[in-house]
């Protein structure tokens, strides 16, 4: 899941 920092989960 791409979220704002801090990244929670995998960055795709």
Swiss-Prot record:
It is found in: Secreted. This is SIFamide related peptide. GO terms for cellular component: extracellular region. Its main location: secreted. Keywords: Amidation, Neuropeptide, Secreted. It comes from Rhodnius prolixus. GO terms for biological process: neuropeptide signaling pathway. Belongs to the FARP (FMRFamide related peptide) family. The modification Phenylalanine amide is found at residue 12.
């Amino acid at each position: 899941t791409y979220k704002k920092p801090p990244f929670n989960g995998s960055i795709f």
